[in-house]
Amino acid sequence: MNTSPKTLKTIAILGQPNVGKSSLFNRLARERIAITSDFAGTTRDINKRKIALNGHEVELLDTGGMAKDALLSKEIKALNLKAAQMSDLILYVVDGKSIPSDEDIKLFREVFKINPNCFLVINKIDNDKEKERAYAFSSFGTPKSFNISVSHNRGISALIDAVLNALNLNQIIEQDLDADILESLETPNNALEETKEEEIIQVGIIGRVNVGKSSLLNALTKKERSLVSSVAGTTIDPIDETILIGDQKICFVDTAGIRHRGKILGIEKYALERTQKALEKSHIALLVLDVSTPFVELDEKISSLADKHSLGIILILNKWDIRYAPYEEIMATLKRKFRFLEYAPVITTSCLKARHIDEIKHKIIEVYECFSKRIPTSLLNSVISQATQKHPLPSDGGKLVKVYYATQFATKPPQISLIMNRPKALHFSYKRYLINTLRKEFNFLGTPLILNAKDKKSAQQN
């Protein structure tokens, strides 16, 4: 075990009650030492323990919650601030499922003032779709933030690596390793910017009743698990099926068909709720449209579910062999009625005859790669700079509107922040222009692109 040549490095875990401090302490210590519960303020004393992080011995402190209205709050706060002052690094934990409060921001900045070597740890970000919530914590004004889920063990390894780097402990172990071992540990030059987690692509099949969703599922999986019938609404519970394409697992969910709201009764209301929950876990939606008859208003409303859940999307035109009109007419109508999905790929098929099924499978993987894409920061800023030079931002009542820089803060879907002097002055039409520019420059096939404007002061404060 490696230790610092001097005294042990000390890490203090601070934050308000019930945000997961003790759970993180237990996770890092790999033992259930601190009491954890849903009751705010279970930790009152400072728990101290020597632990090993990737072979390095450090001292970990778990402190009592710093809530303003807590019993003994003054004493606890004083103790916490003393711990912050004496520590080499602070992990300030917040609840990612809650809205940041002014009190929490004030406490964080007070701690940061005492010890700037401080990480903002956003807990309870249980899956990729919840990362957008973490963006709200940019108001804390620190670039040193980490999204984790202690209960799901997500983001813990990245946090530990950052902790060791901040404490200059990784350098110590590297000096002790043989050069050949170090070479074998190095990341190849052509590796992705982010470590790619082994993940199953979750695909929701959506559409109104009797458009052929179950037939599509059967064709994709080559099974007959999903009941196919001419009777509308034979699928009630979402049905999961997993297939393997190369080394990539894809899980399909055949959701219940959606009717007009006025026709939703009894068990179909339950089915609609299950459909919504299934989409919450999905990465990509296959929107199945029946082209044996003209599109209806409900098709457009259902397509909005993909936008609501920020999903990648592929349009599946089923029953193409008995289409109601020529190709050109259908495509023109599709473009007019679904203009907000102009980035979505379109595939024609006849599910019962299993036409173009392999194309759908490979398109899912292609869209998922776009959905997971991260643009290098330098390249992103180069494109944004060129776009603003080509078409300058409109002024705000005669005052200059400027983009300082851009950064992609999340994937699945890609989410980009523009750090500006007047974020509220960014007009919707100019935002759309920038999004279209990014789509043209980078391949975001079938992928929603989220662009937010933030104030420089709130987004980046040392």
From Swiss-Prot:
Gene3D superfamilies per the UniProt record, alphabetical? 3.30.300.20, P-loop containing nucleotide triphosphate hydrolases
| One term of GO molecular function | ribosome binding
Any idea where the EngA-type G domain is? 9-171, 201-372
Where's the KH-like domain? 373-457
Coiled coil located at which positions?
A: none
| Binding residues for GTP 1 | 15-22, 62-66, 123-126
Record keywords, A-Z: GTP-binding, Nucleotide-binding, Repeat, Ribosome biogenesis
GO biological processes: ribosome biogenesis
Q: Where does GTP 2 bind?
A: 207-214, 254-258, 318-321
**Family annotation (HAMAP family):** GTPase_Der
Quaternary structure annotation from Swiss-Prot or TrEMBL: Associates with the 50S ribosomal subunit.
The record's function comment reads:
GTPase that plays an essential role in the late steps of ribosome biogenesis.
| Family the UniProt entry places it in | Belongs to the TRAFAC class TrmE-Era-EngA-EngB-Septin-like GTPase superfamily. EngA (Der) GTPase family.
Q: Provide the protein name.
A: GTPase Der
Q: Which organism is it from?
A: Helicobacter pylori (strain P12)
